[in-house]
């Protein structure tokens, strides 16, 4: 009977806790390019207009809606090590040998008291701690992004993404950031190391991704377990 009485309370606690567990969400889908109505250039009678390509300029992304290929090559490694050692020791002893002859009276009050050895203490502690951490990440991919905004200084805001599905497992790559037109090569390719405020997300969704995390009950118990 006690078990049935406690069960509703546990279910209420689980319900409260599960609402607080927030799973990390990947970056949102790329923002669609703004529909900008291009100005109608005046034709001064020439065969070439500003709306067409130039004979003296590479065919690179430079306007809203243009696409650019991003070569993603991210490599990062970090390590940290720390150690601490402390120690302290102290000792103290005190006794009463002669004090106007009253040291004998102290011994007469209690036969277990020795006036010559009243206090004798010692203290010692030691601490030794160490820790180390290391991390290494590599990401190599190619992604086509779209210019979604042109800043007043000429820099371009880009965003893009792609999804590859293999055996019902989705591999998702999302990217957004700011690039300079000068960093775009003649083949209309820009390296990810030249992207300002780059946000690159490489996530997965499917059976394999679900198996890489504990079950929901395990996560709940790990969250509320006080020991």
From Swiss-Prot:
Report any one BP term from Gene Ontology: bacterial-type flagellum-dependent cell motility
Specify the protein's topology with respect to the membrane: Lipid-anchor
Of the GO CC terms on this record, one is: cell outer membrane
Q: Does the keyword Membrane apply?
A: yes
The answer to whether UniProt assigns keyword Cell inner membrane to this entry is no
Which residues, per the entry, are lipid-modified as N-palmitoyl cysteine? 16
Q: From the Swiss-Prot or TrEMBL record, state where the protein is found.
A: Cell outer membrane; Bacterial flagellum basal body
Q: Where does the record locate the signal sequence feature? A: 1-15
Q: Which residues form a coiled coil?
A: none
- Keywords annotated in UniProt: Bacterial flagellum, Cell outer membrane, Lipoprotein, Membrane, Palmitate, Signal
Q: Name one GO molecular function term.
A: cytoskeletal motor activity
Q: Which InterPro entries match?
A: Flag_Lring
Residues with S-diacylglycerol cysteine lipidation? Answer: 16
The UniProt entry, under Pfam families, shows: FlgH (PF02107)
Give the protein family: Belongs to the FlgH family.
What HAMAP family does this protein's entry cite? FlgH
Its assembly, as annotated, is: The basal body constitutes a major portion of the flagellar organelle and consists of four rings (L,P,S, and M) mounted on a central rod.
What is the role of this chain? Assembles around the rod to form the L-ring and probably protects the motor/basal body from shearing forces during rotation.
Protein name as it appears in the record: Flagellar L-ring protein
